[in-house]
Design a protein with these regions (language model features):
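M16 family metallopeptidases and their MPP-like homologs
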Residues: 1-3, 17-25, 30-58, 78-85, ...
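Short beta-strand/turn micro-motifs at beta-sheet edges
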Residues: 68-71, 127-131, 185-191
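Peptidyl-prolyl cis-trans isomerase
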Residues: 7-8, 12-13, 61
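His/Glu-based metal-binding/catalytic segments typifying zinc-dependent metallopeptidases
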Residues: 109-168, 172
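Flexible helix-coil linker/hinge segments at domain or subdomain boundaries
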Residues: 9, 107-112, 227-234
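Short, charged, amphipathic alpha-helices and their helix-cap/turn boundaries
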Residues: 58-64
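Glycine-centered hinge/linker elements that transmit conformational signals in sensory
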Residues: 96-110
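Non-catalytic, conformational "gating/processing" segments within enzyme and secreted inhibitor domains
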Residues: 13, 64-100
Length: 281
């Protein structure tokens, strides 16, 4: 029925609009929203496809157009890929799949992704601004990005780098300096529309400590780039990754995500995982 007979409910849609409009209006009073907006605008240079939805946009929602778009997207199941994982009897499942999926509409439409040119800013960009808050704090966001081949080795190395920096910043920023409750470090490798890697570092601190902590953040980035990680930190991360991978292999959700990854990007996130982790310098 999701494909063939989506149910129109004008009352539910009106309720959805009212709830979201009220929530978005309340968000505007949160200083953190201004920070998030500034981060997005700085990275994506005010690209309209990265604009945050605001309360006034809710009134412009066209239910008829939404349903029309939905029906267009789901009128052709031929270009869909359905993935089933779990402890099932394959032979018993096949006729059920044939019955239910075989009855879905199909017009043999072939599609691919479109590059909407939502590119990240290149070069050095810095934006500082002040907003009045009940409790003074400095929110900090650092983003590094660049071209990077999309493969399992680079994905693992980026994950290792993120985790090692997390250990370093926990020791030097949180424990030694007492400057923050924690530093978030996250890395991401993407294939579409361009092969890119990004590393983001986020933390909050007292305004008086911001400058010193930022110096530590960049000094440790420079140190790991030039000298590499300590043997102790590297071994901790390797041990954790191997243990978690062994646990993940028992989960249906992990296999589902891995199959989806392979179909979408061609990268097999399971094959050679352990060998790459143990071999990484």
């Amino acid at each position: 029925l999701t494909f063939t007979a989506p149910r129109r409910d004008d009352d539910a849609f009106a309720s959805y609009k009212n709830r979201n409009k009220a929530a978005l209006q309340n968000m505007e009073m949160n200083p953190q929203v201004a920070f998030s907006d500034s981060v997005s605008a700085g990275i994506y240079m005010h690209h309209p496809r990265r604009a945050r939805i605001k309360a006034d946009m809710i009134d412009k929602m066209d239910y008829d157009k939404i349903l029309s778009m939905y029906q267009d997207r789901y009128k052709d199941a031929s270009d869909f890929t359905f993935i089933f994982v779990g402890n099932v009897n394959v032979e018993e499942m096949k006729p059920l799949i044939a019955e239910y999926l075989g009855s879905l509409p199909a017009i043999n439409r072939k599609e691919t992704f479109k590059d909407n040119k939502v590119d990240m800013r290149q070069g050095v960009y810095k934006n500082e601004f002040v907003r009045k808050q009940e409790t003074a704090k400095a929110s900090n966001f650092v983003l590094l990005n660049g071209d990077c081949k999309y493969d399992l080795k680079n994905d693992i190395l980026l994950s290792m780098t993120s985790q090692i920096l997390d250990l370093v910043y926990t020791a030097k920023v949180r424990e030694d300096e007492g400057g923050t409750y924690g530093v978030y470090v996250g890395g991401q490798l993407s294939k579409y529309p361009k092969e890119k890697a990004l590393l983001q570092i986020v933390f909050e601190t007292a305004p008086a400590k911001r400058e010193k902590l930022m110096q530590i953040i960049f000094a440790e980035l420079d140190n790991i780039a030039k000298a590499g990680p300590s043997e102790g930190d590297l071994n901790k991360v390797k041990e954790f990754m191997l243990k978690k991978h062994a646990e993940d292999l028992k989960e249906n959700s992990y296999w589902l995500g891995s199959i989806d990854e392979y179909l979408f990007t061609g990268m097999n996130p399971i094959k050679d995982y352990e060998q790459i982790v143990t071999a990484s310098p």
